[in-house]
Amino acid sequence: MKLLPSVVLKLLLAAVLSALVTGESLEQLRRGLAAGTSNPDPSTGSTDQLLRLGGGRDRKVRDLQEADLDLLRVTLSSKPQALATPSKEEHGKRKKKGKGLGKKRDPCLRKYKDFCIHGECKYVKELRAPSCICHPGYHGERCHGLSLPVENRLYTYDHTTILAVVAVVLSSVCLLVIVGLLMFRYHRRGGYDVENEEKVKLGMTNSH
């Protein structure tokens, strides 16, 4: 029973102390809030500035987007045919490409370019193989063989005999001409000598 009043006194003292502490802490908090409102922190000010700048940039971006949309609307309304032309061009290109695919290239221009040695290459579609048109004087699958001319013996014999006959005739004609010239000269000289002898005889008779 004697312990009860001491315990009660201690509890009362603890309550009073706690009340004092809580009151002081509340006053400090009020002072801090008052000081914050009168002198704001620079960090809070910088955050406010950043928020304002961010809001301004968002507005600029929105304005640019709206301007781009207006330009697109104007172009679509003013030039509706400009967008239709590329599709036509693409359609024409596709047609050209389709035509080019239908044509097959000649294999003689690439694959069998050097197939024919002395001739012209020609690809046969039915046989699916190349063939050669040889130049004159060549033969073979690839025009690789040289064909030598075959002489006809009868033709050569006739040719040589004709040449021999012509040579004999020409030589005989030449001989006849030479003999005729010699005979003509001899007869002419003989007549000249006779005339000289007659003149000499006449001169001698006149002198007597």
From Swiss-Prot:
Propeptide residue intervals: 20-62, 149-208
Spans annotated as Toxin-binding domain: 136-148
Biological process per Gene Ontology, one example term: positive regulation of cell population proliferation
Topological domains, Cytoplasmic: 185-208
InterPro entries: EGF-like_dom
Keyword presence, Disulfide bond: yes
GO cellular component: extracellular space; plasma membrane
Post-translational modification: O-glycosylated.
Record field: compositional bias (Polar residues): 36-49
Chain positions of site Plays a critical role in diphtheria toxin binding and toxin sensitivity: E141
Sequence ranges of Basic residues compositional bias: 93-102
Superkingdom of origin organism: Eukaryota
Region (Disordered): 34-55, 81-104
Signal peptide: 1-19
Domain (EGF-like): residue spans on this chain: 104-144
Function as written in the Swiss-Prot or TrEMBL entry: Growth factor that mediates its effects via EGFR, ERBB2 and ERBB4. Required for normal cardiac valve formation and normal heart function. Promotes smooth muscle cell proliferation. May be involved in macrophage-mediated cellular proliferation. It is mitogenic for fibroblasts, but not endothelial cells. It is able to bind EGF receptor/EGFR with higher affinity than EGF itself and is a far more potent mitogen for smooth muscle cells than EGF. Also acts as a diphtheria toxin receptor.
Assembly and oligomerization: Interacts with EGFR and ERBB4. Interacts with FBLN1.
Protein name: Proheparin-binding EGF-like growth factor
Organism the protein comes from: Chlorocebus aethiops
